[in-house]
């Protein structure tokens, strides 16, 4: 069995880890970084670029550079969270036929799982380059508070990327696994995970290799992106006050503001004040305009005060659901890049009444935990048991539009639960099962996961038929529901893919598209390598022609020059084979040059042309006769 990789598919950055020699290690990407920006760009030439390369060109290509796509995954277009994103996004977010939020880039629509798959492919390739072998099995992390459709969409992304997703694991649980793997004592810990786009808090009990999640809570639309947006709005408002120009209407300027905001936020974690300098940010009739502002840490904290206040509620709820007080929690583990912000650390300290533990790398710990879980599933890591929970209650709609819960939130998974219901009317031939997820009392206020019908119920007075509804949640937190007429034994089931999820046909098509793109990428890489080789061949041959061209036959020299011209003609070709063929032909023709150079080297002064004296070799270590060497005796004077 090949290696199982652990991938932290983050909103802002992604990371990949594996178990090697019994230890989890984070793998650096081709640029040498241990984290990769979760960005995908589509260039004018039709090329797809990922990670740091995509981030570098974002300012000049804002409409076709996708970021924070995780905030759209598994979400409907009509939700408030998506509407909020549409208002500030430089790229187009559109409504798909199934009601999902998709993106439109260069007149082509893409689903969030499809874009996430491109990022996952980059992480897969990073691992493959390091291991020197093909990787197919993976553990992928998701925010603990992701609902069923978001989990399913993440699993779909893995499939599109050509991965066999062995397990979807919650990010705080993965972090706890990385933190507690070598801990021997029993501990109650809280994992506070504030990343680029999501916020989770989980309370766990650790001991004897058992990691038991007691409760989880969070907000899947709160993270570093929101803090950045506060700074962007402040910069735009200040510039408008000063210059009378609203930069929000200029997508290129807005992208520069985004980069500056992120940089300023990071700098203010280590200093009390930072400068924001953006020359030539825009122009009007009077000429170019420059932006120069100072932002203090105190100002940043006041701008983000409402976001900082939002952190307390989920923490209090998680502790209450776990049946613990703040004083009973032994350690608070900080996860996610946003936990570097001093105001966040201070807020955590106030909520839990203790200094949080900074012993783990907040950017890498989730991927490390996923890598460990991969080792557990493969059998490389022994004596580790992970008991996770479902973050939200699950149930069905019953008479009067009420949500009847079958599985309460924070129930340990995998789990299975059944309940018997009946008909609401006489001679009812079918029942419609409306599956929901959430904590509100009325069905309409919760998230619909799916609908299905159980038909063929024999005529009977209301309340007589016995319909058994069973909920089954697997270890990935993905829901399966079945309904059975106990009278006839007739059964109908549904594997929840969410009413807005991708169909099997759509996923299969996206898998094929991803495979064809991978083949295209390989072809492009081979062409670039062939071009580089050809370029090197042309350079060395032309150099040799200058040096010894007069030593070869004029006809042969003409042949070589023709072959150089032929190779230059095909250099721009996308076909690696054509370039290689022309390179080989030039190499063959250039053999005569190599012979001439060798002959010239043989005749050069100092070469092995010493005639009869060659037999009289100098002894090893002897000095040449013309060197001024003085031989002298010495006498040791004893004191």
Curated annotation (Swiss-Prot):
Induction of expression: By stress conditions e.g. heat shock.
One term of GO molecular function: ATP-dependent protein folding chaperone
Modified residues (Phosphothreonine): 198
PROSITE patterns according to UniProt: HSP70_1, HSP70_2, HSP70_3
Keywords, in A-Z order: ATP-binding, Chaperone, Nucleotide-binding, Phosphoprotein, Stress response
Record family assignment: Belongs to the heat shock protein 70 family.
Main function: Acts as a chaperone.
Record's protein name: Chaperone protein DnaK
Species in which this protein is naturally found: Trichlorobacter lovleyi (strain ATCC BAA-1151 / DSM 17278 / SZ) (Geobacter lovleyi)
